[in-house]
Amino acid sequence: MMAFRAYIINFVILCILVASTVSGYNQKDVKAWCSQTPNPKPCEYFLTHNSNNEPIKSESEFLKISMKLVLDRAILAKTHAFTLGPKCRDTREKAAWEDCIKLYDLTVSKINETMDPNVKCSKLDAQTWLSTALTNLDTCRAGFLELGVTDIVLPLMSNNVSNLLCNTLAINKVPFNYTPPEKDGFPSWVKPGDRKLLQSSTPKDNAVVAKDGSGNFKTIKEAIDAASGSGRFVIYVKQGVYSENLEIRKKNVMLRGDGIGKTIITGSKSVGGGTTTFNSATVAAVGDGFIARGITFRNTAGASNEQAVALRSGSDLSVFYQCSFEAYQDTLYVHSNRQFYRDCDVYGTVDFIFGNAAAVLQNCNIFARRPRSKTNTITAQGRSDPNQNTGIIIHNSRVTAASDLRPVLGSTKTYLGRPWRQYSRTVFMKTSLDSLIDPRGWLEWDGNFALKTLFYAEFQNTGPGASTSGRVTWPGFRVLGSASEASKFTVGTFLAGGSWIPSSVPFTSGL
């Protein structure tokens, strides 16, 4: 009996010792710091169950701890997501699950990037990459919802990572008009040789694609697969129609075509055909630093097949110059990270410029096409957290009717946008709005959803559709009254474009 009591006493002592080693950070400290976040409960739970128990001395230290915490949870969530594959009952569930695996992988990568001591990461960079990580998780959930397969796999996916990401965004929060130090017109990761290459209007090509066999490759995919090294890899795609679905994961790839309507990349995937919006893209730019010039991106699924993306970009610091994007619903998916579009054409019907990037379209032509219903919506911005530094900015552009819409203008309403997510942010500045724009300007998504929390603004637009006298009176809509207000949404400030847009691509930094 004495031996048994000794065993019990030793066991209790061992439990106390083990508990002390995993008791986590000081509970009083944790409560004080976590109370400053939008989601204090998961913050408190995971910190008090962490193996560390040193005092948290500063906000920067709290941010690092929170980053490590969300990274650990994201890795666990990614591992868990892999195990859910066998639970998928059909091809639609499998399609949504496969997207989630990719998106969790990208999420872990982006969080890692913010913490990597070998990667230069300003507060603005961190806010961008954390915003992207949260967008990836939102996109994962959206895939199940849009395919109508939410009852088996989706409930098994935890929201803890999303909540912890929201916390890190709040801790790291960058003032909205934050502008990083000026560089010499290029980002720090572009080497001197690449800078010279990008300054040339006719860059030296690393590979040539031609359908007639006159190049190094007959398909664009073959050329991308051959891309090597960490520097800029320029692929010249000769005139022709290339029926390919491409996911470009390599960094610093440039596709150079012969011009809009000459070099055409086309596909036909769609939600109606059983894929997710995310995976329907004819071309998906994933690797950072992607550049396209003189190319038409097209999805031919048609208006009846619902969402069908021509181009999706999640490439940070990506540039599209003199390109066109052609489809119907969800044409241009500005998914995440920082993106710039100059002298481009965009064609579509419903939500045809959408996503949650920090995206500026400058000097572009936006063509509304004839919809299946009687309603067009140009934008659907997807900002889900108030601290994400994202939004869609249309600057110095033109919004008009495509040729197929003109005969039915009288019976079709076209709106500047509608709020896809709670904190949707869209601005039209110094843009010509033709008479197709409904006097209300903007459309509800679902009743009163997001009308108080969205940020929709207009500044010095022109044309018959530009009058703001009949615009919506939502709390989140405003007409910007001064250049200082509007300048927050220019390329120079919103994208810090002067520090990374290649000098070979013209852009207007201010208003």
Curated annotation (Swiss-Prot):
NCBIfam families: PME_inhib (TIGR01614). One of its GO terms (biological process) is cell wall modification. Disulfide bonds join 344-364. Expressed in siliques. This is Probable pectinesterase/pectinesterase inhibitor 17. Keywords: Aspartyl esterase, Cell wall, Cell wall biogenesis/degradation, Disulfide bond, Glycoprotein, Hydrolase, Secreted, Signal. The PMEI region may act as an autoinhibitory domain and prevent untimely PME activity during transport. It catalyses: [(1->4)-alpha-D-galacturonosyl methyl ester](n) + n H2O = [(1->4)-alpha-D-galacturonosyl](n) + n methanol + n H(+). The keyword Isomerase does not apply. It comes from Arabidopsis thaliana. Residues 237-414 are annotated as: Pectinesterase 17. Residues 1-23 form the signal peptide. GO terms for molecular function: enzyme inhibitor activity; pectinesterase activity. The active site is at residues 330, 351.
